[in-house]
Amino acid sequence: VHMNVNAIEVKAGNLESRLPLGLLLLTPLLFLLAVVLLPLWTMLQQTNADSFRMVWQDDYMRRLLDWTTLQAVISSGLTLLLGVPVAWAVTRLQFAGRSWVLRLLMLPFVMPTLVAGVGILALFGAQGILWRGWEGTPWLLLYGNVFFNLPVMVRAAYQGLCQVPATRLYAAQTLGAGVWQRFICVELPQMLPWLAGGVCMVFLYCFSGFGLALLLGGEHYITLEVQIYQLIAYELDMAQAGVLVLWTLATTFVAGIVYACLSKYTAQTALVQMLPPQIPTARQKLGLLLALLLLLGCCVLPLLAVGWRAVLAGSSWLVLLESTTWLALLNTLRFTLMAMVLALLLGFTHAALAQRLAWVRSLTFLPFMVSPVCVSFGLLLCYPGWTASLSMLVCTYALLAYPFITKDVLAAWDSLPHSYTQAARTLGASRIQVLLYVILPLLRPAMQRGVALAAATCVGEFAATLFLSRPEWQTLTTLIYHYLSTAGRDNYDRAMVLTLLLMLLAMLIFALLEWSKDKKRQSIC
């Protein structure tokens, strides 16, 4: 009896010690419930049959739906057609600076959409450097989508090419297959899951994009996200906005589910001996040159245009000395830091819970399926008393940022050998000790990469800030938009100077991201 009582006391003690840990692991689920699911349910209650009927019977709304879908499809197709040849050239051909090109493909991932939009306006807008005939046409938005998403497709195709075993290519070459035949028969089938995942991600970004469409769409080529913002901010038409939000969510949900399913397949990659880069032939050198020029024109030229316009801004550089600019910079850094603390907690606990429960993995992509405009609109409806609350803004920032941490940490966690934790447990280490002294040190590089990408997301966040921010909470992105939307050459030049500042912040984050990768490589060596 005495032994049974002791056993019961031990089990009760274990349960009591595990209870706080279990509640901590539930934090991301409770957060998603409060910040995503409940606001979406509130939005659903705002709509009715009449509002749906009004939207479908409105010719303007139908054209808006058609254009939003069409521009996402065209952008996905363009990035696929351009990205695959570029990825093949970068993967298969040896050239000077190849490693730097692979690194620079990460740059648009950390570059705010507002910087991309302003850069394209600097090239082809009303005061464009190269051409001024694109204003009021769809080409500005399509070019912006290609700029922002071409690296996504190139990296997806590159990862697929890295999974093609060299033995298959050598065997095909032995059988007389040329470069084109090897690509069609061997490489392309192997790449398809990665390409499909890249297309889904590009479609998601383009369909639910806000910043680029607001800056580059003009009056005739705005998208659903911009229309939702205008309905709420200027017309207070919650019913029609709710219908458009639900349509957006339904579309992005389907694309997100497909992407999540493909990610499960692409995550199960094995170590293969890939074909080493070859010295290009004369014809391949021409193709390589075209690929590099394409990357330069699509991904680097708008950033150079921002720098050039800022250099010529003259007295507009005095905007850096104004108190409004310093307040916006301080708010940007302050909100980012606050969101990073919450995002790090959410990202790590979500990854830890996903290690125990397989279905939690699919929730990693839930914030990607819900655009910032939809999240902000839902929060305004669900929590009207917190409309002017800083905590709501920080929670929105964290929601958009923490999936980057979860994704990197979860991938690194999956690759850890189980023997490490088993050996530590055999030596008498508790679960907490295993976590602190074995798992966390091994996951630190992945956490650093995730935090860098998450911080870049917060620094350049625009849509949620425009919805939820108060005048005294102005950030760099909203201040840039204020100057762009105000007439006058001086305001335009001020916007360029501040955009350069925002771009330099993003590049600093990019440098920190690359530093963490180099540190990881050195630790492995």
Indicate residue ranges for each PLM-predicted region.
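Transmembrane-helix boundary motif in ABC transporter permease subunits
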Residues: 73-105, 118, 122, 168-169, ...
